[in-house]
Amino acid sequence: MEIINLTEGAFDAAVAQGVTLVDFWATWCGPCKMMGTILEQQVVPQLEGVDARICKVNVDDSPALAARFEVLSIPTLLFFKDGALAARMEDVQTPETVVGKVKELIS
């Protein structure tokens, strides 16, 4: 599984089908870096073979997306199922919490 960097133009198509986790972050955000490391090193390996996607949206590069989903603090994780927002988590999360939510949405 590879983490996909999304822009505004590609967002809707990326979340349209299946389960998609989107990490809203910024380069200057310390907790975002921690969450990014957790996603890359712990969540991705646990979700290998699972029918889901993990994407990232830089809020500085895509402020309209952050506004659209009322992302007021970062990191914010949004979970989509077939294009609909299904769950939201703010601040740094444990890998178990993130993986658990993805698997819950798949079942």
Ranges and model annotations:
Residues 2, 25, 55:
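Conserved Rossmann-like nucleotide-binding pocket used by diverse enzymes
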Residues 1-13:
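N-terminal "domain-start" segment that seeds a small globular fold
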Residues 63, 69-78:
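Structural micro-motif
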Residues 57-65:
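Structural microenvironment flanking redox-active thiols in thiol-disulfide oxidoreductases
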Residues 24-38:
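Conserved redox-active cysteine motifs that mediate thiol-disulfide chemistry
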Residues 19, 36-57:
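Conserved helix-turn-beta segment immediately C-terminal to the redox Cys motif
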Residues 15-25:
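Short active-site neighborhood of thiol/selenol oxidoreductases, capturing the structured segment around
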Residues 81-107:
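Non-catalytic, surface beta->alpha helical segment in thiol-disulfide oxidoreductase systems
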